[in-house]
Amino acid sequence: MTQFKEETMLVHPVLIPGSGTRSWTVLGDDDVPVVPVGRFLAYLTDIGRSPNTVKAYAHDMKDLWQFLGFRGLDWREARLEDIGEFVAWLQLPPAGRSGVVTVLTSSVPEVSAATVNRKLAAVSSFYAHQARNDEGPGDLLAAWRTGGRGGWKPFLHHVSRGKPYRGRAITLKAPKKLPRILTVAETQAVLDACTRLRDRFFFALMHETGCRAGEVLGLRHEDIAAAEQEITVMPRENANGARAKSGARTVPVAPELIRLYADYLHEEYGGIDSDYVFVNIWAEPKGQAWSYQAAYDLVLRLRARTGLDFDPHWLRHSAATRWLRDGVSIEVASKLLGHSSVTTTSAVYGHLTVEDARAALEKAGWLTGREVTW
């Protein structure tokens, strides 16, 4: 097997022949693509995985190929024990990965357990894909299990609870990170810091609907039904690269949001000829669909104005948390968020803060009155 040096391996964008769809590949020595990795990444693109997912998997496969190269291993000969060594290798600082420099073991790994698990998911998916094509050592990381997976259980779950499901043989225990949310006051501060209606509408839309930034950037005027007070998120190819991660869904909105949209069209959008809701108005090229970079630049300006080091995705987390706290069922919240499964919604948002616990106890009368005194 060719032993790739770290500096010679690159993740590089490519266009899929025929469709012209943008994807990613990994280049080895002399800018030669790593064929099995390229085929795997092209497959992910063909089945509709998001560009960000494909790019992340490309970096994960680059890490795997570097590790195999340093060990002198061919990917087809790798064993489960080798993947275990790969996990340990990932947690070394870059200077220690080549084996040329010996580094002291640190109590703080180079990458988090969550990041390692994501890379293992990519490796597992790669070997499963190769196994389906009768190549490689088989489904290397697969571990078939029975019993419950934990979390939310659907109606009639008991009917299939003994059915085996595919798990992963290696998974690091990672601390669960609660989603970051904005308080009502913080959300208001972000909105009030917007000096333009377009910018205010952008964040108000995320706050109201729980949509992802990419879904909002991809909105067309035809997706907003003003009379019905509904917004439809549609998966489609967009000129700005924005993408809806899930299938089509329709989200009801408040009349105030529709009025803000109308004000934006009347006072700022004017005669611009574009299908896109969010476009360049003051920057060139005027009328071009707003890009991720333009939205991120706005976030940086708002961080400076408000002193809040926030991320747009926090507005989505805030919407979901608000719905569940206000009694919206988890099934409805899951549909509004565009999750493929209620289990996903439960895993991400099925948490209680101290404030939630206090409110529940007060509602039950535990903190407002006592049957006994002490």
Which ranges hold each PLM region?
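Short, charged phosphate-coordinating catalytic segments
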Residues: N133-P137, M206-Q229, E331
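Basic, Lys/Arg- and aromatic-enriched nucleic-acid-binding interface segment
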Residues: A174-A213, L217, I272
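N-terminal core-binding DNA-recognition domain of tyrosine recombinases/integrases
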Residues: V37-N52, K62-H157, A189
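Short, polar N-cap/turn motifs at the start of nucleic acid-interacting alpha helices
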Residues: I224-A226, L308-D309, V328-V348
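Conserved tyrosine-mediated DNA breakage-rejoining catalytic core shared by Y-recombinases
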Residues: G214, G218-R259
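Short basic/aromatic active-site micro-motif
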Residues: L308-G327
